[in-house]
């Protein structure tokens, strides 16, 4: 689609953006060359990283002041002192800081630590409960960790038992299997093994820390050059400098032979200069102390009589692993002598070098970078540069532990800032559910103070109820108190309006400071104790027995009875369809398929002489169901219960600033049984009679519509000082969902006969099967794999994590508690619930105190069997906190996001757009434009390098920046995820001339998943597959495994729908006879056959898993070689030539059916914004005269960046359930309802080749039924229109908040600039798709124009150029 541009003269903003693009390109080229010193095809990773770290030091030396050096050295000194205080590596479940003295070649610990299993800890707790003397077993404090505490636990070996505090516990040995009830075992290996603890010490970034540091510092250097006003410290420089000083300090402490005089400290500048030269400096006394030998003490595996595993030490493992993964011919000696304490591999944990003094180098270096990003993201806020230095100081003292403690210090300050006396602007009244929000004239400025927050916080601290006492208490923390007080004093009386809304960013940063810690992991072996509250632990620690019947059951029963009245009687046929619906999910579960294959087969490498075997293993639902559906729905599997001998598998989930969590996977037979109940629960909770009580069930994925109740409730709180929102914090609700709660559900199921043929097919009725399953959850057994040889089995009485009904069932529990609270307190309330989240809107009676009321609610919750910490832990008050969103004065605030990823996500090749989208989202949540600009530049520079197996390729700037390239985003400000239309329309105004003349390099394309899967299953009739359903392996009486071919045949017979199958058979030969003689290329049309749908789904699922997980690097390599980006092998003499295409520009027109659209910008028609409270929005015409004046419209997105909130101030927002989007009408041709291997595009392509008289037969050949065919034939004439709309949708994107823009002013403007005849085309009621497309593209272009104007603005007066569509009929 290329468009002849150039008719529009550039505006000043576009000239500035053009200049910025030239600057970006210069930064791109210069920084990339410095960042990637090895420009040849073949690279050595570790040498590259050392060069990068040294260059980062050189940049820091040029930038740093002595004051910054002193601050960085002082932080590292404090860290070193803290390191010497911890001689027990098992004092917490997180990876410890271990010191290796300057004289030691290896870190002084190798033996695994002794660990208590859940079974062992329960026995100790039970012993203490039954021992009046308090000598046997353990108390509550000792039960927090899974390690055996060397200081408080008395351990004796007694044969096959270990006596811990007087309790005999069976110990683990290599001969035990998981069915043995083991009380004492050992942790996973510290290092070396596949599941070694060392992986806890790293965080997952898309690029190496060395690359990230040097890129950020280079960008700071270039921006600071000649600009005295550039705030280098506000961009996180001191934090990064601290990281460099730390790494250099480890090296110096390990290698230095000389000492400074007493009380003489080292200069940071001298330290970095010495590191660059490789000449160790004289070190001060604190470094000398830091590097002295440590005597670590903990209970080891041999201390409890377990034979030591003889694991490798960290230094030994690192050396072997690094040599093993070094490309042939590389300089291995220099790798081992590296000055940097660690090098990062493309996958897996980092390697420690001889320069490493401690185990914390990778983690502390990450913390320095993470807090630098946060510092840059708060540069627009007063006091936060110092705050994030304090955050770094705190996190670095005990790296690896969760940063939740910071939130406990900073979050109260955020809460208080939203409660102190100030003036705020809100609508005079709340809006009806679907109306546009009000103009500014309908707003009022209100004096606001939240005394409820004051009372609750003071009661939590147990101090007098006044602001002075609260302020003194909040700032007691020695390290953080002074900077928090400064921030508080700056903002506590800040007046808030659309032009002055930084307070929302302040609250956002303070609330989620712990996210700077990233995704924290902990010792896997202790998770059964640390990560799960067992039945015994709940009784011992909280006095709650989840088996006992309670008063709340009667309230829950009311809801379950109502749900059962809506349940549709399940049938065996329906169960199959529910299973097929589950197969559309790519999520994992408890069931798995495994088979052996060869890498060369997967890659289609027929010329490879050596075998490269690998095991294809998948627990994704789509692959398991496609291969084994017939094994899932049968009388045996549907009644299967877990046991110690055959437990169910677990997974893990990490959340920023939270402990690692266990996931209790549930087998597919259980999930299919739950489907009818799940649908009934959803239908019940969507009933309008509930007055939106079940909030999430009503959500449409439309941000304003879904938030309207929160917004209105928070506005009501401003107008009514007696109205309060009580956020009941039942964060442990899942852990208390035990037998009692399930018995209520079982009783409700048995009260209503709902069976419909289940007994005939499966031997038991649906009710009996459900009772068996739910009762089985009372003693569910799950295996947790600690490492390759050891797994712990846990007895779990809570609901499995994978249960479809978890959220809805928890909601019923929450509803029961709220109903019980209403009955007991006799205070009317409107509550809103989802899962364990609940808040209630109520007016506090004159004779009641809010603190007393909340304490009463907590007691009632305890009586209901739940722990509710509303007083101390929740955000109750005159703001509304629900589902991670805080709404204050009608304004929404979402939590910040961690910079790292939960799982390894090293950038390899392809689209960096997803990274940029995440970083822009971070910017919109309090991050500011400086942070987004830095992250955008840093990302495109680093993502320009593709690398695999020691070969690399660099993308040129045009391929990244041009429309149709690899990004399609405006490289400044807060760009939309897709700005291809705007970039195409303004391409010649903003791109440097030499860029305009360049093509873009094609994005490497990995093999299609279905082709990969077909290759892997090509020998399906002899390929044996291990299928595990519910923990049991499928095999015949002789123990033989089934073949893939047999599995897929049987699965298809189970999954196929008879009506589709009959119609397929009826028309099969007609279609095949026509296809054999037709003069059209249908490709391999046999793959379209309905009879092959299950095999096709299996091939696609298995191919996807293989390409994305098992063989990702090899498929990346193949794609890059095929695209001409890298050579076939290392050492190749000739450099490949990549394939280029023209930069993708729009044609003169875009087609929407018979209508053509051309977009242009008229430079003389614009909106004018002046950022103060006295001016409205003005629309100017070509004669430079104001023709329309608009008042600002209030909306709930003042926390968003200026470009977004001012656009919405012009349009306003609505709360309707529909949004600005080009509907994907091609979905009408999608076969996703009955087969997963084909897409709508496949069907549309087929229909365009098949003559009209054969279309019905062709569709039945694919598997469509008669009704679907009849409906589809109505749309076949519109295929080209739907394709046009689909292509249009690929040219624009916008933020979710912008999608809710009201269109009345947009429509008014379009009527103003278009002739009546032209507008008539747009307003044709027969063409709703055209009108929708124009509106979407207009608002998308307008949002991009707002972004550019605000990003390039030099004053508070902004002019926004307006896009204009030109429409005509296609003759």
UniProtKB/Swiss-Prot annotation:
Q: Name the top EC class.
A: transferase
> Among its keywords, does the record have Hydrolase?
yes
Q: Say which domain of life the source belongs to.
A: Viruses
One GO location term (cellular component)? virion component
Q: Which UniProt keywords apply?
A: Hydrolase, Nucleotide-binding, Nucleotidyltransferase, RNA-directed RNA polymerase, Transferase, Viral RNA replication, Virion
Which reaction(s) does its UniProt entry say it catalyses? Answer: RNA(n) + a ribonucleoside 5'-triphosphate = RNA(n+1) + diphosphate
Under the GO molecular function aspect, what terms does this record hold?
hydrolase activity; nucleotide binding; RNA-directed RNA polymerase activity
Instruction: Write the signal peptide boundaries.
Output: none
Q: Where does the record say this protein resides?
A: Virion
Stated EC number for the protein is: 2.7.7.48
Q: Which family does it belong to?
A: Belongs to the reoviridae RNA-directed RNA polymerase family.
Q: What does this protein do?
A: RNA-directed RNA polymerase that is involved in transcription and genome replication. Following infection, it catalyzes the synthesis of fully conservative plus strands. After core assembly, which consists in recruitment of one capped plus-strand for each genomic segments and polymerase complexes, the polymerase switches mode and catalyzes the synthesis of complementary minus-strands.
**Protein name (Swiss-Prot/TrEMBL):** RNA-directed RNA polymerase VP2
Protein species of origin: Micromonas pusilla reovirus (isolate Netherlands/2005)
Taxonomic lineage: Viruses, Riboviria, Orthornavirae, Duplornaviricota, Resentoviricetes
């Amino acid at each position: 689609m290329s468009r002849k541009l150039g008719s529009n003269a550039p505006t000043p903003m576009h000239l500035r953006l053009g200049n910025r693009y030239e600057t970006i390109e210069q930064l791109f080229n210069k920084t990339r060359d410095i960042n990637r010193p090895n420009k040849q095809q073949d690279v050595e990773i570790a040498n590259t990283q050392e060069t990068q770290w040294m260059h980062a030091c050189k940049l820091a030396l040029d930038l740093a002041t002595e004051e910054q050096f002193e601050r960085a050295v002082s932080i590292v000194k404090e860290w070193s002192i803290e390191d010497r205080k911890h001689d027990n590596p098992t004092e917490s479940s997180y990876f410890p800081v271990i010191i290796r003295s300057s004289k030691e070649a290896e870190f002084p610990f190798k033996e695994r630590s002794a660990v208590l299993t859940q079974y062992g800890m329960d026995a100790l707790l039970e012993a203490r409960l039954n021992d009046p003397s308090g000598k046997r077993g353990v108390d509550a404090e000792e039960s927090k960790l899974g390690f055996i505490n060397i200081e408080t636990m008395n351990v004796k070996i007694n044969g096959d038992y270990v006596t811990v505090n007087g309790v005999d516990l069976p110990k683990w040995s290599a001969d035990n299997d998981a069915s043995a009830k083991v009380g004492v075992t050992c942790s996973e290996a510290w290092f070396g093994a596949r599941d070694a603890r060392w992986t806890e010490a790293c965080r997952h970034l898309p690029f190496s820390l060395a690359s990230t540091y040097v890129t950020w510092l280079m960008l700071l250097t270039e921006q600071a050059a000649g600009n005295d006003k550039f705030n280098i410290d506000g961009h996180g420089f001191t934090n990064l400098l601290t990281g460099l000083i730390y790494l250099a300090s480890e090296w110096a402490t390990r290698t230095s032979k000389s000492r400074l005089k007493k009380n003489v400290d080292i200069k940071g500048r001298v330290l970095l200069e010495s590191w660059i030269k490789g000449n160790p400096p004289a070190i001060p006394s604190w470094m000398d102390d830091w590097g002295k030998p440590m005597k670590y003490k903990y209970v080891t595996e041999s201390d409890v009589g377990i034979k030591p595993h003889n694991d490798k030490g960290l230094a030994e493992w690192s050396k072997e692993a690094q040599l093993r993964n070094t490309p042939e011919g590389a300089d291995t000696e220099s790798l081992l002598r590296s000055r940097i304490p660690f090098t990062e591999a493309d996958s897996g944990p980092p390697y420690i070098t001889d320069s490493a003094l401690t185990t914390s180098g990778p983690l502390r270096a990450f913390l320095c970078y993470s807090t630098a990003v946060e510092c840059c993201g708060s540069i627009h806020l007063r006091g936060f540069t110092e705050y994030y230095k304090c955050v770094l100081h705190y996190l670095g003292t005990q790296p690896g532990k969760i940063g939740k403690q910071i939130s406990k210090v900073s979050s109260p300050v955020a809460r208080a800032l939203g409660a102190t006396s100030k003036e705020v602007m809100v609508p005079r009244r709340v809006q009806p559910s679907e109306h546009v929000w009000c103009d500014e004239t309908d707003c009022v400025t209100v004096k606001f103070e939240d005394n409820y927050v004051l009372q609750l916080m003071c009661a939590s601290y147990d101090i007098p109820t006044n602001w002075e006492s609260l302020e003194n208490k909040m700032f007691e923390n020695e390290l953080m108190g002074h900077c928090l007080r400064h921030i508080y004093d700056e903002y506590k009386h800040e007046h808030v309006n659309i032009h002055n809304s930084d307070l929302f960013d302040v609250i956002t940063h303070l609330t989620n400071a712990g996210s700077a810690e990233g995704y924290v992991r902990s010792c896997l072996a202790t998770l059964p104790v640390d990560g799960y509250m067992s039945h015994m632990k709940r009784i011992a620690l909280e006095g709650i027995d989840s088996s006992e019947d309670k008063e709340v059951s009667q309230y829950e029963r009311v809801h379950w009875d109502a749900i059962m009245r809506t349940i549709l009687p399940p049938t065996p046929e329906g169960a199959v369809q529910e299973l097929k619906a589950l197969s559309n999910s790519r999520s994992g579960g408890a069931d798995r398929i495994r088979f052996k294959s060869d890498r060369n087969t997967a890659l289609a490498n027929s010329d490879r002489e050596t075998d490269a075997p690998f095991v294809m293993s998948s627990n994704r639902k789509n692959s398991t169901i496609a291969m084994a559906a017939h094994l899932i729905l049968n009388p045996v599997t549907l009644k299967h219960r877990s046991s110690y001998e055959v437990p169910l598998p677990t997974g893990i989930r990490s959340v920023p600033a939270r402990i690692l969590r266990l996931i209790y996977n549930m087998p597919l037979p259980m999930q299919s049984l739950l489907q009818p109940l799940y649908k009934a629960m959803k239908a019940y909770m969507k009933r309008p009679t509930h007055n939106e009580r079940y909030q999430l069930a009503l959500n449409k994925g439309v941000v304003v519509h879904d938030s309207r109740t929160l917004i209105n409730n928070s506005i009501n709180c401003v107008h009514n000082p007696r109205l309060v929102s009580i956020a009941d914090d039942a964060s442990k609700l899942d852990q208390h969902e035990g037998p009692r709660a399930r018995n209520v559900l079982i009783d409700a199921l048995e009260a209503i006969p709902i069976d419909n043929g289940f007994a005939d097919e499966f031997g038991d009725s649906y009710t009996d099967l459900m009772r068996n399953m739910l009762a089985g959850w009372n003693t569910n057994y799950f295996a947790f794999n600690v490492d390759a040889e050891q797994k712990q089995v846990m007895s779990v009485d809570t609901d499995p994590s994978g249960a479809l009904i978890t959220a809805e069932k928890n909601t019923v529990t929450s509803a029961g508690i709220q109903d019980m609270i209403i009955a007991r307190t006799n205070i009317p309330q409107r509550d809103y619930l989802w899962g364990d989240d609940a808040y209630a809107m109520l007016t506090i009676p004159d004779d009641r105190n809010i603190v007393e009321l909340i304490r009463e609610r907590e007691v009632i919750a305890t009586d209901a069997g739940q722990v509710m910490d509303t007083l101390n832990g929740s955000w109750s008050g005159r703001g509304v906190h629900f589902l991670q969103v805080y709404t204050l004065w009608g304004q929404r605030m979402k939590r910040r996001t961690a910079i790292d990823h939960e799982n390894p996500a090293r950038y390899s090749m392809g689209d960096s757009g997803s990274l940029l989208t995440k970083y822009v989202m971070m910017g919109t949540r309090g991050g500011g434009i400086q942070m987004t600009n830095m992250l955008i530049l840093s990302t495109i520079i680093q993502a320009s390098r593709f690398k695999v197996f020691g070969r690399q390729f660099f993308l040129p700037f045009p391929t990244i920046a041009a429309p149709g390239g690899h990004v399609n985003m405006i490289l400044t400000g807060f760009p939309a995820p897709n700005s291809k239309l705007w970039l195409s329309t303004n391409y010649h105004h903003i791109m440097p001339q030499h860029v305009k003349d360049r093509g873009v390099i094609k994005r490497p394309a990995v093999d299609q998943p279905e082709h990969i899967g077909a290759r892997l299953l090509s020998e399906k009739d002899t390929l044996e597959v291990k299928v595990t359903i519910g923990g049991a392996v499928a095999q015949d009486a002789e123990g033989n495994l089934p073949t893939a071919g047999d599995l897929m045949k049987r699965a298809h017979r189970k999954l196929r729908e008879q009506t589709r199958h009959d119609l397929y058979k009826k028309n099969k030969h007609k279609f095949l006879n026509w296809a054999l003689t037709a003069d059209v290329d249908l490709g391999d049309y046999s793959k379209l056959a309905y009879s092959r749908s299950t095999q096709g789904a299996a091939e696609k699922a298995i191919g996807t898993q293989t390409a994305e997980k098992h063989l990702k690097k090899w498929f990346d390599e193949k794609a890059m070689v095929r695209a001409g980006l890298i050579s076939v092998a290392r050492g190749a003499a000739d450099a490949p030539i990549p394939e280029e295409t023209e930069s993708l520009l729009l044609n003169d027109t875009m087609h929407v059916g018979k209508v053509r659209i051309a977009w242009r910008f008229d430079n003389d028609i614009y909106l004018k914004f002046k950022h103060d409270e006295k001016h409205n929005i003005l629309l100017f015409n070509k004669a430079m005269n104001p023709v329309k004046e608009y008042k600002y419209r209030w909306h709930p997105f003042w926390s968003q960046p200026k470009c977004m909130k001012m656009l919405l101030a012009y349009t306003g927002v609505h709360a309707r359930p529909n949004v600005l989007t080009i509907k994907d009408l091609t979905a009408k041709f999608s076969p996703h309802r009955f087969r997963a291997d084909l897409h709508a595009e496949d069907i549309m392509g087929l229909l365009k080749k098949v003559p009209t008289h054969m279309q019905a037969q062709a569709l039945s050949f694919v598997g469509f039924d008669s009704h679907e065919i009849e409906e589809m034939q109505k749309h076949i004439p519109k295929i080209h229109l739907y394709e046009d709309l689909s292509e249009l949708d690929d040219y624009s994107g916008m933020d979710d908040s912008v999608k809710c823009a009201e269109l009345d002013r947009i429509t008014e403007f379009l009527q103003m600039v278009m002739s009546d005849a032209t507008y008539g085309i747009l307003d044709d009621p027969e063409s709703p798709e055209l009108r929708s497309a124009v509106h979407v593209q207009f608002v998308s272009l307008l949002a991009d124009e707002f972004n550019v104007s605000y990003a390039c603005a030099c004053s508070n007066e902004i002019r926004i150029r307006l896009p204009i569509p030109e429409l005509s009929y296609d003759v």
